[in-house]
Amino acid sequence: FDIRGVLDRGSFKPYSGTAYNSLAPKGAPNTCQWKDSDSKMHTFGVAAMPGVTGKKIEADGLPIGIDSTSGTDTVIYADKTFQPEPQVGNDSWVDTNGAEEKYGGRALKDTTKMKPCYGSFAKPTNKEGGQANLKDSEPAATTPNYDIDLAFFDSKTIVANYDPDIVMYTENVDLQTPDTHIVYKPGTEDTSSESNLGQQAMPNRPNYIGFRDNFIGLMYYNSTGNMGVLAGQASQLNAVVDLQDRNTELSYQLLLDSLGDRTRYFSMWNQAVDSYDPDVRIIENHGVEDELPNYCFPLNGVGLTDTYQGVKVKTDAGSEKWDKDDTTVSNANEIHVGNPFAMEINIQANLWRNFLYANVGLYLPDKYKYTPANITLPTNTNTYEYMNGRVVAPSLVDAYINIGARWSLDPMDNVNPFNHHRNAGLPYRSMLLGNGRYVPFHIQVPQ
């Protein structure tokens, strides 16, 4: 039989970036722990999930509900195998009752080497989505023994009658970063430490693997009389035809070029014609609109608030004195003083800067790049791991805001300008090699 078709391998990633915590700041850590030089444990991060209002944290953990089905209220505590879930926090920014809430969260133990949150992935280990590793090499026949421990925290100002405000469910997970790599590493070791909280991640570069064109100078060929072959091979008269002069041959080539599709012709030779996105090879710039400031605000439009009670002037005294007004005014007034908390970001400048860095900076020659401190890269400079790990100083492209109407860096023209993720020739060559998402196949089995 003879089968020809195209296999769709499904998942394929011809872009930079990550699907794992893609909105996280690239220098933000996961909630995690580390030990200092005195072997004392430190915890840093977020406890996002509030417990039931009015219920305290107990040794069993964070109270997350009340079971009233039996007629008696029974506190429901978080199931440590997957609760509190790190993506669950307050339902709303509204918090005006003045009650003290207890909070819980998840943290990575110091034995899980810390990585930036951006790009972090840990496989689930149970059907609810919990990610903790098993303590035992073999799961127990009844209940798996997960590597999870509870850590309790109280306010630093409390000196007596301690009562935890926060419980962190600390765990070891199989932490991976399949789409990112470290580009800023303050610590000299990979182990969890205070300095490594400040690590920064960067997305991996798109990785197309395709061979180069061997006949890049060849336009078309002709196996019949125009090239002077024996007619027996060309099914014509058995006579040798003289070669045409150069002008005739060139005219014939140009005729074929205008009639046929060069890309289709090259594919017969397992080659690809390189294309180029015009915005990459030659950057067209007609100005960057950058007039208005762009602000971002907290969800509640205010920011952090303090709780205030109402007061009024005392009327039964000779001099003006103040008294609390708890008859008509609540004692839980959440008020922020000063202007609303806001931050400004220049969106246009960041989009332009990111475009230049991703499409120009990352494709500059290796001599313009450097290896980040404390990062070890392969000695073979031809490997993807080496090329992917090298970074460019952003200042190389930062300054090009007004660059004229048509502009390109010299290396974009004279140092392998086709080795770029926007070049359609690369994914096509990957496809021919069986490396891309779509893989043509042809299976022939003789009778």
Curated annotation (Swiss-Prot):
Residue stretches spanning the membrane: none
Keywords: Capsid protein, Cytoplasmic inwards viral transport, Host nucleus, Host-virus interaction, Late protein, Microtubular inwards viral transport, T=25 icosahedral capsid protein, Virion, Virus entry into host cell
Induction details: Expressed in the late phase of the viral replicative cycle.
GO BP terms, alphabetized: microtubule-dependent intracellular transport of viral material towards nucleus; symbiont entry into host cell
Superkingdom assignment: Viruses
SUPFAM superfamilies per record: Group II dsDNA viruses VP (SSF49749)
Disulfide bonding pattern of the chain: none
Gene Ontology annotations for the cellular component aspect, listed alphabetically: host cell; host cell nucleus; T=25 icosahedral viral capsid
Subcellular location: Virion; Host nucleus
Cross-referenced InterPro entries: Adenovirus_Pll_hexon_N (IPR016107), Adenovirus_Pll_hexon_sub2 (IPR044942), VP_dsDNA_II (IPR016112)
Self-association and partners: Homotrimer. Interacts with the capsid vertex protein; this interaction binds the peripentonal hexons to the neighboring penton base. Interacts with the hexon-linking protein; this interaction tethers the hexons surrounding the penton to those situated in the central plate of the facet. Interacts with the hexon-interlacing protein; this interaction lashes the hexons together. Interacts with host dyneins DYNC1LI1 and DYNC1I2; this interaction might be involved in intracellular microtubule-dependent transport of incoming viral capsid.
Role played: Major capsid protein that self-associates to form 240 hexon trimers, each in the shape of a hexagon, building most of the pseudo T=25 capsid. Assembled into trimeric units with the help of the chaperone shutoff protein. Transported by pre-protein VI to the nucleus where it associates with other structural proteins to form an empty capsid. Might be involved, through its interaction with host dyneins, in the intracellular microtubule-dependent transport of incoming viral capsid to the nucleus.
Protein's recorded name: Hexon protein
Species the sequence originates in: Human adenovirus E serotype 4
